[in-house]
């Protein structure tokens, strides 16, 4: 088409190249060499994963091509808190960091856990709430292998019971259905906690200073995260 194309990424032949990354808390600091040779540093505040670094690099590259203030953009990027329920930092108490994430599809689950494991935490604990009885029945059937491996990198996995979202229960379908899929796949530290009232006490027993807890799912598991932070701080 005759239009100029500018590439960005980690490869040496990119016009804008990400030179280095460093995990910082629940975020990632990175340095970027711009197409004109300048090097800028910035930080993704609370969304881990190289894909988020790549997104940040794209923004700074575009800013530079438009002739705008890249240094100011790099500074402001560090203040961006990200999207709600996407590695949403809820708080830290008792040396334990708690984040909340909407992931409920196996690809999202695996990507979120992988990004978390790249951060500077001792262990990563996932509290997962399955969403809808119909989805659990379907996903653990036709996507059994994908869900079985999605939690592989988590140090521990705790399954809550199913968030119904208004659906009637399906006989034989509970949070334990997910547990069976994951343990059959070989995860050594996965459990099912059927009663909601027991979830926070269980996570208090599991998490230790230096650990990260991710409350995960599309249901009301998000309400557990602040409760857990409160209890950790007592």
Kindly give the residue locations of the regions a language model identified.
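Short glycine-/acidic-enriched loop or helix-start segments at secondary-structure transitions
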Residues: 17, 136-137, 168-169, 202, ...
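Active-site beta-alpha connecting loops in nucleotide-dependent enzymes
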Residues: 83, 115-185, 195
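A glycine-rich beta-strand to alpha-helix segment
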Residues: 198-229
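Hydrophobic/aromatic beta-strand patches that form the interior of the parallel beta-sheet core
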Residues: 6, 19, 125, 156-158, ...
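Glycine-rich phosphate-binding loop signature in dinucleotide/nucleotide-binding domains
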Residues: 66, 116-122, 206-211
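A short, gly/pro- and small-residue-rich
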Residues: 4-8, 174-183, 227-234
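Adenine nucleotide phosphate-binding catalytic loops in nucleotide-utilizing enzymes
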Residues: 3-110
